[in-house]
Amino acid sequence: MTKSLVTGGAGFIGSNLVDQLIKIGHKVIVIDNEYSEAHEQFYYNDKAEYHNLDIRDDATRSLYDGVDYVFHIAAEARIGPSIENPTETVSINSFGTCTVLQFAREAGVKRVVYSSTSSAYGLQEPPHVEALPDDCLNPYSISKVNGEKLCKMYTDLFGLETVIFRYFNVYGNRQPIKGQYAPVIGIFLRQLENDQELTIVGDGEQRRDFVNVKDVVQANILAATKKLDKDALGQVYNVGSGCLLYT
């Protein structure tokens, strides 16, 4: 049986991925310390094996033994908290990613799929193609891009296969809708539930690319399990719909 490990597997994107991996017959191990500024709750699948641990903890090392694929989603995933506590954000997102990669390398994992962010493009005008230079404007985005560089380095230097995804605005089943750091779709849903007007920040000319979590899950599984050319490994790929909507 194929064995997959998902970091952050009890959160929004991770829990959807866990469910689909189990559905297609994978044995799934989850590392999640249930810490998030955005999630009002966490989600569990009875058929998965859960470990309430920090990805930086050496106690997670043995969990990688026998694992085929690692899906690294765990992160401090909001800009606001990263500005309030940049050192912790960099520790989780950069050092934490290095720890995941090192443990995966030591265990002989076949491939690591890394979840990064379109925030790496900063305020550059669309289209946001992968060839654009990084424009990191906050600790969150730069810490995630550091993780990207680590993935490429582990591929080039150590031969650990990695694939890097930059997600745009992910929405769908289990998305956070509460708290000051909820994403924009969650905020809109919360306002609709409370019969409030939708809040538009700025002049209303902002455009965003929204991608359904089902598509993100499918991209992760394909990236992990399909044969890829050597040149495709350690590279960054956008995951979005390709359509810009005014928000």
Tell me what each language-model feature is.
Residues 1-170, 224:
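N-terminal Rossmann-like NAD(P)+-binding domain of SDR-like oxidoreductases, especially those catalyzing
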Residues 170, 186-199, 208-237:
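Alpha-helical substrate-binding/gating segment
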Residues 108-112, 159-161, 197, 203, ...:
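Active-site loop of short-chain dehydrogenase/reductase
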Residues 137, 168-182, 202-214:
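Glycine-rich "substrate-gating" loop/helix at the edge of Rossmann-like oxidoreductase active sites
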Residues 246-247:
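Conserved small/polar residues in nucleotide/adenosyl-binding loops
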Residues 10, 34, 204-207, 242:
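Short donor-sugar binding/catalytic loops of nucleotide-sugar-dependent glycosyltransferases
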